[in-house]
Amino acid sequence: MVDEILKLKKEKGYIILAHNYQIPELQDIADFVGDSLQLARKAMELSEKKILFLGVDFMAELVKILNPDKKVIVPDRSATCPMANRLTPEIIREYREKFPDAPVVLYVNSTSECKTLADVICTSANAVEVVKKLDSSVVIFGPDRNLGEYVAEKTGKKVITIPENGHCPVHQFNAESIDAVRKKYPDAKVIVHPECPKPVRDKADYVGSTGQMEKIPEKDPSRIFVIGTEIGMIHKLKKKFPDREFVPLEMAVCVNMKKNTLENTLHALQTESFEVILPKEVIEKAKKPILRMFELMG
């Protein structure tokens, strides 16, 4: 099946982009594997006009927004993000009225419709940097409460998080899990995602996005790393650092990320169906806060 996918991909002129949380078999056939920001940037650099995206809906839509002239297809239309779907345009409008001077900073894990109402988009890799650079001591931030709290800690700014309890179910680790792995692997370094709750972040050695997690073993010579994010990241790290050991903090699985399989990836290439289509107005409005993010990052 892998050979058939690679053959069809070449024949039809597709580039395959996969998120770090995809199953190992899909990471291995992808032309590029990365976090949402890395994938969006990669898509902008491509000369190819056809992209098969392996991730969840908001990520594929982000690629389409930044590459409106390219054909973007996905293997499973139902692969979505529960956290992104918790934030609605109505909630954003409500908080804009309450805090008219506060810029709206939306995490990339948000719907395209919500992005049209944002002042700037951020990722888990650059959220702190983006908020620091905004000329405001108060920001409205959504939809991840834990990332919002982390940004508040690091910037000293007032961060109003929306919706009330926005969070990623996959990253709800227990701080006790860190105590347990430290007993089992006393020399290990613990790296967790900023979407984790504060008690977990506070006990970790490092807090970082999946893109940042990849860079830590380049600087830290430790032999064992405990990883607090979705299980797919372990495969990416093991491939990049075969001489190190990577242990999951807990068996955290994103069922939506795992909806993509070799079977439906092959089917997507065969039929070229499930194309990502967005209204022109949404593309134009959502693109502005994304480009603002790139501007702020320099």
UniProtKB/Swiss-Prot annotation:
Inhibited by 4,5 dithiohydroxyphthalic acid (DTHPA) analogs, which bind to the catalytic iron site of the [4Fe-4S] cluster. It is an enzyme of class 2 (transferase). It catalyses: iminosuccinate + dihydroxyacetone phosphate = quinolinate + phosphate + 2 H2O + H(+). [4Fe-4S] cluster binds at residues 81, 168, 254. Its EC number is 2.5.1.72. Iminosuccinate binds at residues 19, 36, 107-109, 124, 193-195, 210. This is Quinolinate synthase. The lineage of its organism: Bacteria, Thermotogati, Thermotogota, Thermotogae, Thermotogales. The gene is nadA.
